[in-house]
A protein has these predicted regions:
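N-terminal-biased segments
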Residues: 1-20, 86-87, 141-146, 155-156, ...
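Conserved active-site and cofactor/substrate-binding residues in soluble primary-metabolism enzymes
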Residues: 1, 20-23, 52, 90-93, ...
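Residue-level signal for inorganic ion chemistry
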Residues: 10, 47, 68, 140, ...
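Structural motif
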Residues: 40, 69, 138-139, 169-171, ...
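Conserved catalytic-core segment of NTP-binding enzymes
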Residues: 155-210
Length: 210
């Protein structure tokens, strides 16, 4: 496939796939060699401002001298916009190489009578391949559905996985990982701290209130 054909294939995925479980995402990552374990992930969730927050975090890390990947959605013009390395959108060749690896895996899974990765899973898997091959130190990842429903959750190296959310309601949606840090802040009239503590009681991570 060339670049245009690859994009057309991805855009057509929702027509022939259904939502998969998180176990499916983990299995795909494993069969790709667990590329997500080659860097640290900052997983950003919340109602509004996720993309801006991801960009801010990436800029700060770049100023500190780190190599960074950025994964956001949706794209505005071209699908490549979802993937940035050191604040630069990836080129078509990089996109196509990652697609070919994920497409090969997808074909193998279908041939085995298993599942085909969803639209978002396909892009997420491509992103992990792209960032691993680029050798980045950090990846700032904007959540998709988020929480227990999102394929971008619970697949990361927990020793370096930080989560930022607009209030601990994000934590209560099961985004926070055992062994990781969670950064949150209060807003509105609900007792977000109490909610965060209730959820965090079952986790081994630290809750830092700002």
């Amino acid at each position: 496939m060339n670049y245009e054909e690859a994009v057309a294939y991805i855009e057509d995925i929702p027509r022939f796939t259904t939502k998969n479980s998180l176990d499916h995402t983990r299995e795909c990552l494993k069969r790709l060699g667990d590329p997500q374990r080659k860097f640290r992930v900052i997983h950003v969730a919340g109602t509004n401002g996720k993309g801006s927050t991801c960009a801010f975090i990436t800029s700060v890390l770049r100023e500190a001298g780190y190599s960074c990947g950025l994964f956001t959605s949706p794209h505005l013009v071209e699908i490549n916009e979802r993937f940035q390395i050191n604040e630069e959108v990836i080129d078509d060749d990089t996109f196509l190489r990652a697609f070919e690896k994920v497409k090969k895996l997808s074909d193998e899974l279908v041939a085995e009578g298993s599942y085909h990765p969803t639209y978002f899973e396909t892009l997420l898997l491509m992103g992990m391949v792209i960032f691993a091959e680029a050798g980045v130190d950090y990846v700032t990842l904007e959540t998709g559905l988020g929480g227990i429903r999102g394929s971008g959750d619970r697949s990361w190296r927990t020793s370096g996985c930080n989560h930022c959310g607009g209030g601990s309601g994000s934590l209560c949606d099961h985004i926070h990982q055992p062994g990781s840090y969670a950064v949150s802040w209060e807003y509105g009239f609900r007792d977000r701290r109490r909610e965060g503590r209730d959820h965090g009681a079952g986790c081994s991570g630290d809750l830092r209130w700002k």
